[in-house]
């Protein structure tokens, strides 16, 4: 159970209990969430929104020779967390074979964090300041696309170098039929050690406040609430191909055309599981319309990034697509960009949006889950995992309180041995307490978002795997 950077960030946010405090998910971007850095908010489909650093600070956009408020710095606060899991189970598979599986996980951190902040009274120095005449290109894009921008006004930074460490180990004993299946004797296993350095100055959590830009001046709102737009005087005119924003009202069973009022942001409609299920189904249906060759490139490229466990590559690719930049990129991400530049796919299907949908779902998950997803694809257990996750989400999605539930035996039956251990670890990383020899658990509201992202990721990968199953390609890195 490697204790990843994003998991530690979420843990620290929970312990700080600060209102509107958000975790930083990617270590490579941990220095891009410092004070005054500008963030672009982008929706993550059904699960949440993503704050993307644009690479500029507010101070870069203002006219020179102006006073800068002095930040307030708190004393360092220590945060220590150690988590260990030791699971064993004896499993029966249709009375054909009897075997055992064990999982041992350990992870934790010892971090000192201090906050740097600019309180609202000090922000008055920057209110109504004039912007540069020649603004960066990204500002023009955001104005045209009506993107909202935010500025970091409080950041929780690591006050000294530290290290995240962890260990995960799966041991599988097999007998009878499974001895031939796995071609081993006695015990098979997998063990991984984790060690992630976190340099001083890395931001674990932050607060943001919205920017409003009008008449070439900027105003920083007191909070990040969506009551105004960053560019309030810029209407987004509907095109012939996309005249209105169409959404489904499930309760009434009606299609409704809704034009978003100028100068305001529409609050997202209530999402129940049926909405999420329909959204994922629609996306995978479009994915299935792509050519087999395109799906092969996407699958092999995504799997290479998942196997490498390099969240930065996934994150960089997502940022490039979010900012509509199809420039050069090495490795598997570059192969996906090559396909996008070809633009030879089905004209009715937006390949970029489909890849973004998958990347946004993957970025909700932990580093451990990314690697476990790759293993799940290779083991061919995705359809069973999709149904299992669906069986958890469907009855519990709308409830904000803790509810005990029991996993259905018929859904667990195909997931035996290492497949069950991998699936349980995926669920545990979402925040559910799982035991291999116990199908009972408890619904936790905080698990809703990562479980939804896991459901979307599994469904996407299942469709890609299905398209590639006839040719049976190697799914290891370097396939294409």
Swiss-Prot record:
Protein name: Gasdermin-C2
Domain note: Intramolecular interactions between N- and C-terminal domains are important for autoinhibition in the absence of activation signal. The intrinsic pyroptosis-inducing activity is carried by the N-terminal domain.
Keywords per UniProt: Cell membrane, Cytoplasm, Lipoprotein, Membrane, Necrosis, Palmitate, Transmembrane, Transmembrane beta strand
Pfam families referenced in this protein's UniProt entry, alphabetically: Gasdermin, Gasdermin_C
Location of the region described as Triggers pyroptosis in the Swiss-Prot/TrEMBL record: 1-226
GO CC, one annotated term: cytosol
Induction, per UniProt: By type 2 cytokines in response to type-2 immunity following worm infection.
């Amino acid at each position: 159970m490697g204790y990843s950077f994003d998991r530690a960030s979420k843990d620290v946010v929970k312990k700080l209990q600060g209102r509107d405090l958000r975790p930083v998910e990617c270590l490579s971007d941990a220095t891009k969430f410092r004070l005054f850095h500008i963030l672009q908010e982008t929706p993550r489909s059904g699960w949440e929104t993503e704050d993307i650093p644009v690479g500029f600070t507010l101070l870069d956009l203002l006219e020179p020779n102006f006073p800068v408020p002095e930040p307030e710095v708190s004393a360092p606060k220590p945060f220590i967390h150690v988590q260990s899991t030791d699971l064993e189970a004896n499993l029966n598979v249709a009375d054909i074979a009897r075997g055992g599986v064990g999982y041992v996980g350990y992870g934790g951190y010892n971090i000192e964090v201090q906050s740097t902040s600019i309180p609202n009274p000090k922000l008055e120095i920057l209110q109504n300041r004039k912007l540069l005449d020649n603004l960066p290109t990204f500002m023009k894009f955001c104005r045209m696309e009506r993107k909202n921008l935010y500025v970091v006004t409080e950041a929780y930074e690591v006050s000294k170098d530290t290290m995240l460490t962890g260990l995960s180990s799966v041991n599988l004993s097999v007998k009878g039929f499974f001895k031939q299946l796995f071609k081993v004797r006695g015990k098979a296993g997998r063990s991984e050690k984790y060690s992630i350095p976190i340099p001083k100055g890395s931001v674990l959590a932050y607060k943001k406040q919205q920017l409003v830009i009008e008449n070439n001046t900027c105003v920083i709102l007191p909070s990040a609430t969506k009551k105004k737009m960053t560019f309030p005087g810029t209407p987004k005119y509907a095109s012939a191909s996309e005249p209105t924003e169409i959404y489904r009202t499930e309760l009434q069973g009606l299609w409704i055309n809704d034009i978003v009022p100028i100068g305001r942001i529409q609050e997202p409609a209530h999402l129940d599981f049926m909405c999420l299920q329909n959204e994922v189904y629609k996306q995978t249906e479009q994915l299935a319309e792509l050519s087999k060759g395109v799906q092969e490139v996407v699958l092999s490229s995504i799997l290479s990034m998942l196997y490498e466990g390099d969240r930065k590559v996934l994150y960089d690719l997502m940022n490039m697509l979010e900012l509509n930049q199809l420039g050069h990129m090495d490795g598997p991400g570059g192969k996906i960009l090559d396909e996008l530049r070809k633009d030879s796919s089905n004209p009715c299907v937006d390949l970029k949006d489909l890849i973004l949908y998958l990347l946004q779902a993957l970025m909700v998950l932990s580093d451990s889950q990314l690697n476990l997803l790759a293993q799940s694809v290779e083991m061919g257990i995705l359809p069973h995992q999709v149904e299992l996750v669906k069986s958890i989400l469907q009855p519990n999605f709308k409830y904000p309180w803790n509810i005990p539930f029991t996993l259905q035996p018929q859904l667990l039956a195909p997931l035996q041995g290492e497949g069950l251990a991998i699936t349980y670890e995926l669920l545990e990383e979402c925040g559910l307490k799982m035991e291999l020899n116990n199908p009972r658990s408890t619904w936790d509201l905080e698990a809703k978002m990562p479980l939804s992202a896991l459901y979307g990721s599994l469904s996407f990968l299942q469709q890609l795997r299905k398209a590639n199953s006839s040719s049976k390609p190697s799914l290891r890195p370097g396939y294409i």
